A protein has these predicted regions:
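Short amphipathic alpha-helical "interface-anchor" segments enriched in bulky aromatics
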Residues: 107-111, 211, 252, 263, ...
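Conserved, well-structured functional cores that handle cations and Mg-NTP chemistry
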Residues: 2-206, 210-227, 234
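Intrinsically disordered or highly flexible coil/loop and linker segments, enriched in small
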Residues: 29, 33, 53, 201, ...
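Buried hydrophobic packing segments
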Residues: 142, 191, 338, 364-368
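Basic, amphipathic alpha-helical segments enriched in Lys/Arg and hydrophobic/aromatic residues
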Residues: 342-394
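An anionic, glycine-rich sequence signature occurring as long contiguous blocks
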Residues: 4, 21, 147-173, 177, ...
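Catalytic-loop motifs flanking and including active-site residues across diverse enzymes
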Residues: 138, 330, 334, 357-363
Length: 394
């Protein structure tokens, strides 16, 4: 991935104003009134700008408005469908980044630290963002990553039971009546189901151990014939060599000759080298699929281990499995870019619609930057190839 401080520069180099206008044409029609359509574009411009905090007053100033009332109307009361814009975003990402050979879907969550009790979904809950239990909102996200780049394509706000079971809080925050409690894994499955139904070109599903630890999640993917590579805790039990034991117990007995340094497929040389052990688990012969346990070991510290379970077509080379396992980190980069570049966590809204609208527009702005960066990179490569061709002919 390209460093964060180079993203906006890449956009400028590619002549991003015209490209942003084309993107706005894709989503502007989702707004009922022209005022909202125009303000969506200005909001995107504000998110793409270099203001330090992209909240109400700062955003209003950046887009040339006297006060934040217009921005607040766009997020809270204007008539437009954030889910329809999300679908437009997914099509945009697939159009520019889609690749059946290298595409993966990545699920993860992130926290948004908050004060008070009014913001929809806020509660004292654990988030990896803080590494602790804090007052925050938690959003589940789905990203698409390929050899061309990575961007978000879906999102879902997690509502704890303290919210779904409280009619007064729900009404005040504008939570739709049909919204019921769903745990984070169920939210991830719903997002994946939407991606599957839309035909997003992905060979694998990737997730960290929060999702991968659950047999039910892995079984859900297998029932749909979806290959996966998910992190798992060392305490998970797997059948190996006729005995079902904790992964850490199996690993303690591994001979040294099962380890080998593996460079993943699609490696650009920038990934850290690891030693890997790839162990066969049970086959799913009727579907032509197989399960594996992969163990990653640091070449510097043999005690630094990572564990993955994978399910995919028979004969999948270890280089591909290793590459897919490492693809999970692409969503971490997406979170860093979306929060650091386009203000995904800078909002001051409290209601259900406003959260989804702000986050969706941030996802759209981030995807735009990823696409512009890709175009700039491809243009630079074409120029290099052209210069080499001229030099050769000379």
């Amino acid at each position: 991935m390209v460093a964060q401080d180079g993203i906006a520069e890449s956009a400028a180099v590619a002549g991003w104003s015209e490209a942003l206008g084309e993107l706005h044409e894709r989503v502007g029609h989702r707004c009922v009134r022209s005022e909202a359509r125009k303000r969506v574009k200005r909001y995107l411009l504000g998110l793409l700008g270099r203001i330090e905090r992209k909240n109400g007053w700062r955003m209003a100033e950046a887009i040339g408005e006297r006060d934040p009332q217009g921005v607040q109307r766009l997020l809270n009361s204007a008539k437009w469908d954030a889910d329809a814009v999300r679908d437009d975003l997914r099509k945009y990402v697939v159009e520019h980044l889609g690749d059946q050979q290298t595409g993966v879907l990545i699920v993860d969550e992130t926290g948004f630290l908050k004060r008070g009790e009014k913001s929809v979904g806020v509660a004292r809950q654990y988030t990896g963002t803080a590494g602790d239990t804090v007052n925050c909102q938690v959003g589940a996200f789905l990203a698409y990553s390929s050899g061309k780049g990575a961007a978000f394509i879906d999102r879902a706000l997690y509502l704890p039971k303290g919210w779904t079971g409280d009619p007064a809080r729900r009404e005040e925050a504008g939570v739709p009546e049909e919204t019921v409690f769903r745990n984070k894994v169920e939210l991830a499955e719903e997002m994946l189901e939407r991606a599957f139904a839309a035909g997003v070109p992905a060979r694998w599903v990737v997730a960290d151990s929060f999702y991968g630890r659950l047999h039910s999640f892995r079984e859900w993917l297998e029932a749909r014939g979806r290959p996966y590579a998910v992190m798992v805790p060392k305490t998970n039990a797997v059948p190996l060599g006729g005995r079902k034991k904790k992964i850490e117990q199996h690993v303690e007995r591994l001979p040294e000759d099962v380890w080998s340094e593996v460079r993943p497929a699609q490696d650009d040389g920038g990934r850290r080298p690891w030693e890997w052990a790839c162990l066969d688990l049970a086959a799913d012969s009727e579907k032509g699929m197989r399960r594996w346990l992969l163990v990653r070991r640091s070449t510097d510290d043999p005690e630094d281990l990572g564990f993955y379970q994978a399910y995919g077509p028979e004969g999948t080379p270890i280089e591909e499995l290793v590459g897919v396992c490492q693809d999970r980190w692409a969503i971490e980069q997406c979170f860093a870019e979306a929060k650091g570049e386009v203000g995904m966590d800078h909002y001051e809204v409290r209601r259900w619609d406003a959260w989804h609208r702000h986050v969706t527009l941030c996802m759209l702005a981030h995807a735009f930057l990823v696409v512009v960066r890709l175009a700039a990179r491809e243009e630079e490569e074409a120029e290099r190839v052209g210069k080499r061709g001229i030099s050769t002919r000379a």
